[in-house]
Regions:
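Short beta-strand-to-turn element immediately C-terminal to the catalytic PLP-Schiff-base lysine
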Residues: 143-146, 167-168, 391-392
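Glycine/proline-enriched, intrinsically flexible loops and inter-domain linkers
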Residues: 165-167, 322
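Charged substrate- and nucleic-acid-binding regions of tRNA-handling and nucleotidyl-transfer enzymes
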Residues: 1-75
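Domain-length cofactor-binding catalytic modules of enzymes
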Residues: 92-99, 106-110, 121-125, 136-140, ...
């Protein structure tokens, strides 16, 4: 019969995550159990009490848990091992007002979710962008400022640091027609889509030299997956595409007005970010108990281990998502034998520490929203057959310096499969001169809102600098489950 043992998972449930400390706790706990000094339940109860208040255990000379208590005290002095207590919160009784752009384009479900979000006790301000639609917790297109020491994993999004990246080449736009097969081949050779997608050869792996990959066990355990997926794209609405960029006079310093060949990509932090989001959203919902309608808006406190771990992980996922795009763009640029004259990129699923117009420091969550501070460049795509836009933020304080992250869904994926037909989609692509590789009916242009109406609704948020017309589009194969 197998002897009873205290597992590492049981110790982690108490909040023990530091590798060295975990080993010490396991050695002491299982030693006491093996020699029948204490029963398992008694050992775990003592360990939980020790973590809550290590001093009495440290002062007890010759005590069984003396060394462990000193480990905890040492970690606390370093600002670690501060557990977030399990707490129950009520929503504010009054619903704060929040500005909405393009109200006529937004479904009632998204509005209801935003109303719930601004009722959180940690909410400071909110805003809803014209591409908004219902999501989990915060609606996609929702912007929420909370107290600066709180962060909501589900308000960042499941695909942490989902982002856009645009490379502009000093090559005439008509090349997209005259060299179509060559450009199509570059996408096939240098992009890889899907949940299990990996790459064999890498362009730049320097990100993996960062010590941050050793900060927490969660990150360490995901490093190999992240490395394997470097330079890949996700599923759903993620894409890499060639198109024509029509640039206005004086829009970008050093680049004359004209029509340029450009490469645009949309994806995030892949399985690395997805696993982080799943792990920490569950912890947040365990630690922060909210009414049912708000449960996905559970937060973590940044002055606790759990909050610090998520903050570190989220920022690393941001760097990783950027590296993914750079890997794709650099490989294609090398094969094309042209360096881009400019590369522009932005997150639209992330949280930033910022200041409101009155000077209040807050945590700004943008879930499917583009940063649009004064002078900040961003990219707002349409769909596979409608234009995207290179924009410059106007710094509108009411929008919390934000704009839409795209056109936004007009219908759900299931509705698209039920109501659209392949002939209609094919005719649209022919009419717009689109070459499409991959994708399915749920990503059809008709499944999205009118990007021109969305842009018109946010003229006071961003200035349009250039229009990007997609022409050669690659997305995940139809068999792939959407990640976005």
């Amino acid at each position: 019969m197998e002897k009873e043992k205290i597992s590492n998972n049981e110790l982690k449930a108490l909040g023990i995550n530091e590798v060295d400390v975990l080993e010490n706790f396991s050695r002491v706990a299982n030693g006491l159990l093996k020699h029948n000094v204490m029963q398992k339940a008694e050992i775990l109860a003592n360990l939980e009490a020790l973590i809550e208040d290590p001093v009495p255990y440290a002062l007890k000379k010759g005590g069984k848990f003396n060394n462990l208590a000193n480990d905890v005290i040492a970690l606390r002095k370093k600002g670690k091992f501060v557990k977030q207590e399990r707490s129950t919160f009520k929503l504010k009784t009054e619903i704060a007002e929040f500005p909405v752009w393009g109200l006529e384009h937004i479904e009632t479900g998204a509005l209801a979710q935003m109303r719930t979000a601004v009722q959180l006790p940690v909410a400071v301000a909110g805003a809803l962008m014209p591409d908004a639609h219902q999501g989990y917790g915060l609606p996609i297109g929702g912007v929420l400022a909370t107290t600066v020491n709180t962060i909501i994993p589900f308000a960042v999004g499941v695909d942490i640091a989902c982002r856009m990246c645009l490379s502009i080449f000093d090559i005439p736009a008509e090349t997209v027609d005259s060299k179509k097969e060559m450009l199509k081949g570059l996408l096939l050779d240098h992009t890889n889509f899907g949940m299990g997608g990996t790459t064999r050869t890498k362009f730049d792996t320097s990100l993996f030299d960062k010590s941050t990959w050793n900060e927490t066990k969660v990150i360490r355990n995901l490093k190999d997956k992240a490395y394997a997926q470097l330079g890949t794209s996700g599923t759903g609405n993620h894409f890499v595409e060639w198109g024509e960029l029509c640039l206005a006079e004086g829009a970008l310093p050093g680049i004359p007005a004209g029509n340029y060949l450009a490469l645009l990509s949309h994806s995030g932090s892949r399985g690395f970010g997805g696993n982080l989001a799943d792990h920490y959203s569950k912890i947040a919902m365990t630690k922060t108990k909210l009414p049912a309608e708000a449960k996905h808006l559970a937060w973590l406190d940044l002055d606790t281990d759990e909050g610090q771990e998520y903050w570190i992980a989220m920022n690393l996922a941001g760097e990783y998502a950027s590296a993914n795009h750079h890997e794709i763009h650099n490989k294609i640029a090398r094969a094309l034998n042209f360096e881009p004259v400019m590369r522009i990129e932005n997150h639209h699923n992330f949280a930033w520490k910022e200041r409101l117009s009155d000077g209040t420091e807050v945590m700004v969550h943008r879930k499917g929203a583009t940063p649009a501070g004064e002078g900040v460049l961003g990219i707002i795509p349409g769909s596979m057959s409608t234009p995207g836009f290179l924009v410059r933020g106007k710094g509108n304080a009411a929008s919390i310096n934000s704009a839409s992250h795209g056109a936004g869904r007009l219908m759900s994926r299931s509705a698209a499969f039920k109501t659209l037909n392949k002939a209609l989609i094919a005719a649209n692509l022919v009419d717009k001169r689109i070459t499409l590789m991959g994708s399915d009916m749920d990503e059809a242009p008709m499944a999205y809102k009118d990007i021109h109406a969305v842009m018109a609704a946010q003229e006071n948020l961003v200035e349009v600098l250039a229009k990007f017309e997609p022409r050669i589009v690659r997305m995940a194969d139809p068999k792939e489950r959407p990640e976005d």
